Amino acid sequence: MKFKLVPEAPETLAFVADAQRAVPLVPGSEDDCCARLMRRLDFPSRDVARTWLTFLRAVELADETDDGSFVRQDTDPTPDHLRDAFVRRIYGASDVLALLDSEPKSVSEVFEGFEERVPVWEHHRAAESWQDVWTERVERMLAWSVLLGLAERREGGYVAAEHA
């Protein structure tokens, strides 16, 4: 399963651990989990909290149970774990990374290379703004890639990380 929602990248990976700790060990409803995330991490809205909850599921730090409640996973959010889960489970992450090389590319240039991978149904779902929505998603994937050491930000754009 691949996930599309990616929150804005935080300043440090320690924030991911804080977000994971905000998800209960005892299963809770989506509303309860979002309220906890908002309270503990000062998220400005339920939408931001829900995006983080979805992202935590994507990177295998939280899970949705069969009854629709959410629970924290007993997985350490190490950089290696986060890199692996990000590339495997975030829709488009591996494609975005494959577009990077040693020449800096702007967000627009990366989106241009990625655009054909946007599912057709997404074009109809947000007909007037799908390109804006997906450009923002690409930008967020790039920011997370930098945070995770999979890419580097240089003058003029993003490049593949030398060790990635």
Segments the model singles out, each with a brief description of its role:
Residues M1-A164:
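Donor-sugar nucleotide-binding helix/loop cap in glycosyltransferases
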